[in-house]
């Protein structure tokens, strides 16, 4: 009955009544049934309407669900786009994180460099302050010197006197220099006079062990304030004891050299004895000794040396090597 429309339901009811018309049923017995059927029809009608409303509602819901499906599809597409964007952002954030880490490391290195530079700047500041102080002090000293120079320049006479070897002429102070001692240079280094090699003959006289004389050929090498003697004999010297004194006097030079002054020792050199190397031949035996000489005056010196034996003998090939400061 639920699936029948009202007209169909009436026909069903009429059929039931016709089938039961031969049954002995009173009108009063059918009344409740009729009422119940009427109520049932009303309920069925109401149910049909409710089902119709529900169907409409379901149709609306279906339409809404379809709209929601489309909306969800759009949302899904948007979410996919957002997912792609978020992935790209994550990659960018990862790259940025790496860059930030690198920048942090560089910043730390730069901070260390800046700290070192700051320390250097602080040290330079101290040095500059000290330099400023020194410059200020030097400026005062220079100003004082300028004032003193101006005062000296404005004075007609400097009022100073100089002792040798300093001398003054026309306001210029000079140093009297010996060219054999130093050169006229800024540092006064070495001597400026040229070296000389003077060759001459010198007659030496034997005393205290010999009364003989011997002729010596002399090479005198003069350099600066030094003269080195290299002498050799041209004859024999007769000796009578085991020690002989041989005297050299500038007056006994037979061929005067070009610069006799370079054979005169300085006063300081004359104050002490000086070493002399002597060698000679006696009786075919060669003897060599280191003897000493002494000046008795600025022009005379005597050397004392062993003769290599006792008694009278002739010594030959006598050589004498020594040097003096002039």
Swiss-Prot record:
Function recorded in the entry: Structural protein responsible for cell attachment. Induces cell apoptosis.
Keyword terms of this UniProt record: Apoptosis, Capsid protein, Coiled coil, Host-virus interaction, Viral attachment to host cell, Virion, Virus entry into host cell
Domain of life, per lineage: Viruses
Family matches, as Pfam families: Reo_sigmaC (PF04582), Reo_sigmaC_M (PF17750)
Subcellular location: Virion
CDD domains, per the entry: RBP-H (cd07964)
Coiled coil: 60-80
GO biological process, one term: virion attachment to host cell
Similarity remark: Belongs to the orthoreovirus sigma C protein family.
Entry protein name: Sigma-C capsid protein
Subunit structure of this chain's protein: Homotrimer.
């Amino acid at each position: 009955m639920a699936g029948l429309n009202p007209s169909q339901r009436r026909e069903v009811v009429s059929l039931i009544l016709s089938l039961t018309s031969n049954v002995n049923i009173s009108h009063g017995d059918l009344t409740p049934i009729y009422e119940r059927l009427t109520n049932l029809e009303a309920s069925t009608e109401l149910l049909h309407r409710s089902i119709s409303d529900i169907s409409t509602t379901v149709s609306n819901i279906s339409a809404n669900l379809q709209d929601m499906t489309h909306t969800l599809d759009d949302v899904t597409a948007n979410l996919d786009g957002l997912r792609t964007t978020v992935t790209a952002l994550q990659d960018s954030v990862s790259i940025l994180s790496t860059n930030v880490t690198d920048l942090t490391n560089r910043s730390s290195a730069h901070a260390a460099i800046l700290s070192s530079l700051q320390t250097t700047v602080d040290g330079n500041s101290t040095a500059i302050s000290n330099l400023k102080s020194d410059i200020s002090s030097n400026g005062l000293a220079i100003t004082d010197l300028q004032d003193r120079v101006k005062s000296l320049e404005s004075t007609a006479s400097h009022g100073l006197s100089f002792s040798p070897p300093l001398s003054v002429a026309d306001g210029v102070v000079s140093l009297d220099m010996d060219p054999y001692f130093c050169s006229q240079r800024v540092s006064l280094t070495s001597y400026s006079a040229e070296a000389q090699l003077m060759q001459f003959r010198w007659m030496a006289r034997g005393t205290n062990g010999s009364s003989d004389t011997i002729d010596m050929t002399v090479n005198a090498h003069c350099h600066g304030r030094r003269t080195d003697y290299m002498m050799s004999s041209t004859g024999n010297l007769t000796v009578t004891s085991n020690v002989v004194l041989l005297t050299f006097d500038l007056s006994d030079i037979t061929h005067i050299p070009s610069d006799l002054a370079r054979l005169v020792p300085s006063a300081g050199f004359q104050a002490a004895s000086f070493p002399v190397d002597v060698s000679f031949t006696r009786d075919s035996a060669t003897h060599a000794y280191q003897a000493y000489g002494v000046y008795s005056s600025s022009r005379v010196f005597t050397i004392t040396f062993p003769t290599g034996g006792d008694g009278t003998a002739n010594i030959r090939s006598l050589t004498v090597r020594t040097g003096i400061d002039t």
